[in-house]
């Protein structure tokens, strides 16, 4: 079952936390859910070259806080903060004007330890007509240098322009998908090539998080380990 379900959703409340943190009644919930989707889609389209790993949205009664984790904060901030100000103005048109908007940018120290950025690297290489085996091999080497304990990459489609689509995958180290305490990062992306669309999936194993360890507290953003077990 661990190989079929989404690795991040499978670990919500254990080693992963929600990317959107807010509460709403049954009437407002679908509106806010669509609003979150619009926010993420707009940021990814506007900052497609900013190497964004994740976007977290926290809502309060009169405030919306957006956290952007990126490997290239200079592109997001812009010259003298002009980029982030332009982004804030554009996002305010999507949100309720009565709510205050805050946008925080966090720099990712090691981009090769993020599955999203590894998958984007592979898709960029494939769209530049680099052989898929070479692109995957480079991505695996970069992930290993980032001190990940295991990496698995799968590429599907008309590989190297073959007539019949197929899937090939490479794994180095351990990637225990069925171990709930395993800190697994996952991402899937699409590469649009002249031969069609190629699917790219990346799994990164960053180590096991034990219930009594402090790393679980930081991973799930809770105050005590007991609260994670309840």
Curated annotation (Swiss-Prot):
Entry's Gene Ontology BP terms: translation
Molecular function as annotated in GO: rRNA binding; structural constituent of ribosome
Cell location: Plastid, Chloroplast
Presence of keyword RNA-binding: yes
KH type-2 domain residues: 39-109
GO cellular component assignments: chloroplast; cytosolic small ribosomal subunit
InterPro entries: KH_dom, KH_dom-like_a/b, KH_dom_type_2, KH_sf_prok-type, Ribosomal_S3_C_sf, Ribosomal_uS3_bac-typ, Ribosomal_uS3_C, Ribosomal_uS3_CS
Sorted UniProt keywords: Chloroplast, Plastid, Ribonucleoprotein, Ribosomal protein, RNA-binding, rRNA-binding
One Pfam family cited in the UniProt record for this chain: Ribosomal_S3_C
PROSITE patterns from the UniProt entry: KH_TYPE_2, RIBOSOMAL_S3
Oligomer and partners: Part of the 30S ribosomal subunit.
Family the UniProt entry places it in: Belongs to the universal ribosomal protein uS3 family.
Identification of the protein by name: Small ribosomal subunit protein uS3c
